[in-house]
Amino acid sequence: MFVFIGCTRLAGSDYPMDTKFLTLSKREGRGSLEVTNAALNYGYSILEKFCWSALENAGLELYAGLLHVDRPGKPSLVLDFMEEYRAWVVDRNIIKLRARLGKETSLTPDLKTEIINGIDATMSAFITHRGKKVRLENIMQRQAYRLAGAMTDGKRYKSIRFKW
């Protein structure tokens, strides 16, 4: 998990250009006015809430990260945990909206609704995990418990792999 997440972080700046997003010339963080960046940021904020809830239910300290630097007010562990789900939950949904994003100049309420609905559908979707059909939201909760086990009992944490 740790090596994989570190590699994805380093590759993140090249990712959008490689997938030929219509409106994205470079990745920008919070406060971006460019529509694709704003859509990604909006989607990540929704994903953050799902991850926050799963980790909190598992009894983990949300501000004590493993990869992200601990900073006051930053839920570092939540940001670490999100890495496992970013591409599958958010990026896929934003890519599906690329035709709309190319026509918009800002993140409209209708576009926000589409992002919310897409992410909600993804989190509610049944995925085969360990031989069983399980909702992604439940898989996320199980992964949070596994992470708690890895942190407290020294067990090995194995991240989930999504098949495109």
Residue locations for each model-derived region?
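Active-site helix-to-loop segments that bind/position phosphate- or nucleotide-bearing substrates
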Residues: M1-W164
